[in-house]
A protein has these predicted regions:
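Periplasmic/cell-envelope proteins involved in peptidoglycan metabolism and beta-lactam response
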Residues: 1-208, 230, 313-323, 365, ...
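Beta-lactam-recognizing serine transpeptidase/beta-lactamase-like catalytic domain environment
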Residues: 131-136, 140-146, 184-236, 240-488, ...
């Protein structure tokens, strides 16, 4: 007794779509909970217009009715990769967790996914008695076993709205990431991945279509490059090398190494820019000398008296890198985190059939070669140096209503490098900010520490920065990674400085506002290559 065509016109769907929906609804493979005697979801999220028309004509469609429900809304247009989104459960979701039934919503990305169980709450239960025709005859045992629904828990994020908005502005027209962390807690203050999208596109009936459009975009706006991008860290990695060489006794703070246009030994040349030579650690960091760190690695890997074999030396080196947060997932409370890559001896034994030495792998000492890291790992390195030897696993959730954070995020994680050696690295990063490769930071009235990186790439080099401020009692650690941005001083340092100023001062100076506007307008031509 159903006028199917009238129903289709009312809901603004075709007859073919009606048939497809009914087939899906009755298919027990796609809808395991189907029963002709229980209510089934035919269509969700009607538009205001369709709802109004349907309400007027509902009496013509026996068996169909409307049920109100809450849907997710996002107030602002920023932080899409952090917030994530929700969507209707898939058959696999239902199969994996019997909490869900068709028509339920589940977190798909970001915080929505990581904290799904805290956000979803608990469903209410009402047990009803029905006759053989499915008609309700009353409550079972007068509702004795019924249960009221329990709302999900409120989450408080650590994201600073103004900082996040500024970071997204600065990266417009560029591919890359900005991550800022509070060193004393591990709380993530901003996590910017560019290109991005408006999280409000992932709400409502158009979510599926909008998701398809974003998925097809060759610049991959759905990719959270802050935790999924795996890049060479470039010269920001030199800080880890200095700490390792000092802690292992390969060098002292005053040990100098020569650099005449680079590292030159046994026919191998690793170039470097002009600066005084020879240099010890602190000025080698401030000038970003390649030669110093190449020599340091060469002497560590070749020290058979201390390590016995190059393999044992290499694995000791790797242990230091892992202790500093590289080569494994840090454990951030967001889905999809990549681990980056830190090679061990077996990698080179396989590649070179056991015939290799420090010269073979010299490029890893300057953050090139096989070494890769995520922007989050680079920012975490900044936080570790700021803390002089320990870090908290970075996280975006600051507080869970009536609950405690996982101890993963509240326990300190110490590195293998000795605490006293961090002061030399801090001195080098401060010197870089006052007169070295990060000297653009000298304009600020807070004591910033920084390290540039210019990561070699098949095309134009990537621009990288890692730093923190102030030098003592630091409040913020920052990593900036701009694909094909050129020198670290071209994009990394100025963008990192603006992020520091915004957070420490609460607003940008008039001069900095003009500089931020300038960088917002800058575009990098990436051509038509898919990334």
């Amino acid at each position: 007794n159903l006028d199917t065509l009238e129903l289709c016109r009312t809901l603004n769907i075709t007859r073919e779509e009606f048939d497809a929906r009914m087939l899906k609804l009755k298919d027990r493979n796609r809808n395991p909970g189907y029963s002709r005697y229980t209510q089934q979801l035919f269509m969700s999220q009607l538009s205001d217009k369709s709802f109004s028309v349907f309400q007027e004509k509902m009496y013509r469609f026996p068996g169909f009715y409307v049920q109100r429900r809450s849907i997710r809304q996002y107030k602002h247009s920023i932080a899409a990769h952090v917030l994530g989104d929700v969507a209707e459960v898939s058959p696999s979701d239902i199969e994996n967790d019997d909490y869900y039934i068709p028509g339920d919503y589940i977190g798909k990305q970001g915080v929505e996914r990581s904290y799904e169980k805290q956000l979803r709450g608990e469903k209410g239960i009402q047990i009803l008695l029905r006759d053989v025709h499915g008609r309700i005859k009353g409550s079972y045992m007068n509702g004795e076993h019924d249960r009221l629904p329990v709302p999900g828990k409120n989450l408080t994020l650590s994201i600073d709205y103004k900082l996040q908005a500024l970071g997204e502005r600065l990266l417009e027209g560029k591919i890359g990431s900005i991550v800022a962390i509070e060193p004393s807690t591990g709380e993530i203050l901003c996590m910017v991945s560019s290109p991005t999208y408006d999280p409000r596109l992932m709400v409502g009936r158009l979510r599926s279509e909008n998701h398809k459009v974003l998925s097809r975009d060759s610049w991959k706006p759905l990719l959270n490059r802050s935790i999924m991008g795996q890049y060479p860290p470039g010269s920001t990695f030199k800080t880890t090398q200095g700490l390792t060489f000092l802690s292992e006794g390969i060098v002292t703070p005053s040990t100098p190494f020569p650099c005449s246009g680079g590292f030159n030994f046994r026919g191998l040349h690793v170039g470097c820019h002009g600066h005084p030579s020879p240099l010890p650690l602190v000025p080698s960091l401030s000038t970003s000398c390649n030669g110093y760190f190449c020599w340091g690695l060469y002497y560590m890997i070749g020290n058979k008296k201390k390590y016995g074999t190059v393999q044992d030396a290499m694995n000791k080196w790797r242990d230091y890198m892992v202790s500093m947060g590289f080569g494994y997932r840090l454990g951030v409370d967001l889905p999809g985190e990549k681990r980056g890559f830190i090679p061990n001896a077996s990698v080179y034994d396989k590649a070179y059939r056991g015939s290799w030495n420090g010269l073979t792998i010299i490029s890893i000492s300057i953050g090139q070669g096989e070494v890769t890291a995520t922007p989050l790992q680079i920012a975490n390195l900044g936080a570790t140096i700021a803390n002089r030897g320990y870090y908290y696993v970075p996280h975006v959730v600051k507080e869970i209503q009536n609950d405690n954070l996982d101890t993963l995020y509240t326990n300190r994680h110490y590195t293998m490098a000795h605490e006293e050696h961090y002061e030399y690295v801090v001195q080098g990063m401060r010197a870089a900010a006052t007169g070295g490769t990060c000297r653009a930071l000298a304009q600020y009235d807070f004591e910033a520490c920084g390290k540039t990186g210019t990561a070699q790439n098949r095309g134009r080099d990537h621009s990288v920065f890692m730093g923190f401020a102030p030098m003592n009692n630091p409040k913020i650690a920052v990593a900036v990674y701009v694909e094909n941005g050129g020198w670290g001083a071209d994009y990394g340092v100025p963008l990192g400085g603006l992020i520091m100023e915004q957070y420490l001062k609460g607003e940008l100076s008039e001069t900095s506002k003009a500089r931020a506007d300038e960088f917002q307008k800058r575009r990098i031509n990436y051509g038509t290559d898919r990334r």
